[in-house]
């Protein structure tokens, strides 16, 4: 059982370290660039990325749309292969199997350790143990309360000098348990009733970070300028061809960094002062003129026209940026995580759905934030 715990500890730490290794330049903004989207919609891109490597163990079929998570799997595969983690007693397929997008079956070693791990938690054997343990580990990598969110919320709150992203991580972690409901069967993370308030703080803090930091008018405005600047420099055939090469060749993909595009922006802005690249290099921001919540696409267009009329400017000078402010997946039938409740009379513990214990998660809903801007005069002229 000790060796099983040690093995899963190493597997999950490796998965946490590698799960975002497929992010390219400027993280999520890169894959939102319209020209990049077209490149990544190439039906042969997945096959080109993997070359002669057999991926049957990882994917049952080639994905229709390539996302950064697919690049993370490709990068993680190569890193684990090059560092020869197999010689250290860790099967790379086990690390990849708990990361997003894969549909792989864990190794025999994983299954053996899962059985011992299961006996440690439950005290008896179960044929479904490998599957249930893999799903449990996957939820820690990518779930409603995962390692990534716990990390970036505190980090982003600190570096943006705000307190709204704060929550008591130590209290939350100390009140997390393994939950096991044998009648279903269900295995997953459970939070004690004492730690439920920390979970509520965690979810609400993330919601507030999206509303006030990630969807801040200045942040979204520069995100828009950045995407347009990337589109702009990709009009150069040599740059476009190199980026396409990077998206299919892992040796080149590692060179597709922020610095690469910053140099492209500098070169382009010297020759073209009335450009998005010039705005990015010289920190010329969009002029914010309005913010609206939860607008439909038709309402966005309508408000855009009204603003253009009020300001007496052409419609094309008004720019919009929209971000989804997702509150939480925790709703009435949410089953990925439960609450461990102690009966005050029998003193027996039982697992309940989070919404059966807390009404907090029904008080908020997902929404959208749309900012409206006027283009800088340098772009208009």
Q: Where do the protein language model's features map onto the residues?
A:
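Sequence-structural signature of the catalytic-core scaffold of metal-dependent phosphohydrolases
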Residues: 1-14, 22-290
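Terminal helices and disordered tails flanking the catalytic cores of nucleotide-processing hydrolases
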Residues: 213, 218, 227, 237-381
């Amino acid at each position: 059982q000790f060796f099983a715990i040690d093995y899963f500890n190493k597997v999950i730490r490796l998965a946490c370290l590698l799960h975002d290794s497929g992010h390219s330049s400027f993280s999520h903004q890169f894959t939102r660039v319209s020209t990049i989207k077209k490149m990544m919609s190439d039906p042969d891109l997945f096959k080109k990325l993997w070359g002669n490597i057999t991926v049957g163990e990882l994917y049952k079929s080639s994905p229709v749309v390539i996302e950064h998570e697919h690049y993370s799997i490709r990068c993680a595969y190569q890193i684990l292969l090059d560092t020869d983690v197999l010689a250290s007693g860790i099967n790379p397929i086990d690390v990849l199997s708990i990361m997003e997008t894969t549909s792989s079956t864990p190794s025999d070693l994983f299954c053996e350790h899962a059985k011992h791990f299961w006996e440690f938690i439950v005290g008896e054997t179960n044929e479904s143990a490998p599957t249930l343990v893999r799903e449990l580990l996957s939820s820690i990598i990518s779930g409603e309360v995962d390692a990534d969110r716990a990390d970036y919320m505190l980090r982003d709150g600190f570096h943006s000098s705000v307190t709204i992203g704060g929550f008591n991580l130590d209290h939350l972690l100390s009140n997390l348990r393994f939950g096991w409901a044998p009648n279903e069967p269900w295995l997953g993370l459970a939070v004690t009733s004492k730690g439920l308030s920390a979970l509520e703080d965690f979810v609400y803090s993330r919601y507030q970070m999206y509303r006030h930091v990630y969807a801040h008018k200045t942040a979204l405005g520069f995100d828009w300028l950045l995407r347009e600047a990337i589109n702009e420099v990709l009009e150069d055939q040599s740059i476009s061809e190199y980026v396409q090469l990077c998206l299919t060749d892992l040796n080149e993909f590692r060179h597709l960094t922020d610095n690469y595009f910053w140099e492209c922006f500098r070169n382009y802005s010297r020759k073209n002062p009335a450009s998005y690249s010039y705005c990015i290099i010289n920190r010329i921001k969009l002029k914010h003129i309005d913010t609206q919540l939860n607008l439909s696409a038709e309402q966005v267009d309508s408000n855009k026209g009204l603003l253009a009329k009020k300001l007496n400017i052409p419609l094309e000078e008004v720019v919009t940026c929209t971000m989804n402010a997702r509150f939480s997946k925790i709703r009435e039938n949410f089953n990925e995580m439960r609450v461990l409740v102690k009966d005050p009379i029998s003193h027996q513990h039982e697992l309940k759905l989070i919404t059966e214990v807390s009404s907090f998660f029904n008080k908020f809903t997902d929404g959208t934030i749309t900012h409206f801007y006027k283009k800088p005069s340098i772009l208009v002229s």
